[in-house]
Amino acid sequence: MRSGVIAQKVGMTRVFTEAGEHIPVTVLKLGNCQVVAHRTTEKNGYVALQLGSGARKTVYMPKAERGQFAVAKVEPKRKVAEFRVSEDALIPVGAEIQADHFVVGQFVDVTGTSTGKGFAGGMKRWNFGGLRATHGVSVSHRSIGSTGGRQDPGKTFKNKKMPGHMGVDRITTLNLRVVQTDVERGLILVEGAVPGSKGGWISVRDAVKKALPADAPKPGKFRLANGGDEVAAPAAEQEGA
């Protein structure tokens, strides 16, 4: 199981195929996504990579956080996240994961925070049908109707769908296809929409419900901290070696 990456949503555009068909894509940018720390079975009880992305001023950071980045010899990061991996998929601390960590044509799962919509009614928030337009209904056309029973149970149950704050939820979209990658600019173009607003932080990982392509690099494509490029062999070549 390979590591994912932390990216920022740039926006949406479209790309054209050789046949002239256009594909709507979301542009995701890797902002110097580096490995900050390892989580091991011996020390933590599980295996994972802690990644960091984006620049952050140290003046706004607690001393403890600054110490963690200093130990890893990594510049302070604005966003930090963990990705569970297998033991053979650990990437050295300080290495920068590149955009071609994902190959064109493979499917990925993306996770982000949905755009906030503020206070919304039942029809917008939960797709309720509303009440009738006439025949005894006045003023309350967009209300949700009854919310509970009679004297028994005498209450409204928890998790009842009602008006309230809409958006700002953690959303995962499955099986988005990678259309293009740009290593020099650190861009990943995925087909379709990605949850969140422009500039929002997105987690991208290999699709859980789709097979990993044979040419996907393991443990990944990354640049070492000393400036050297680590070219990981595709999984098919590693198995045949």
From Swiss-Prot:
GO terms for biological process: translation. SUPFAM superfamilies: Translation proteins. One of its GO terms (molecular function) is rRNA binding. The keyword RNA-binding applies. Pfam families: Ribosomal_L3 (PF00297). The modification N5-methylglutamine is found at residue 151. GO terms for cellular component: cytosolic large ribosomal subunit. The keyword Protease does not apply. It comes from the Bacteria. Residues 139-164, 215-241 are annotated as: Disordered. HAMAP family: Ribosomal_uL3_B (MF_01325_B). One of the primary rRNA binding proteins, it binds directly near the 3'-end of the 23S rRNA, where it nucleates assembly of the 50S subunit. Part of the 50S ribosomal subunit. Forms a cluster with proteins L14 and L19. Belongs to the universal ribosomal protein uL3 family. This is Large ribosomal subunit protein uL3.
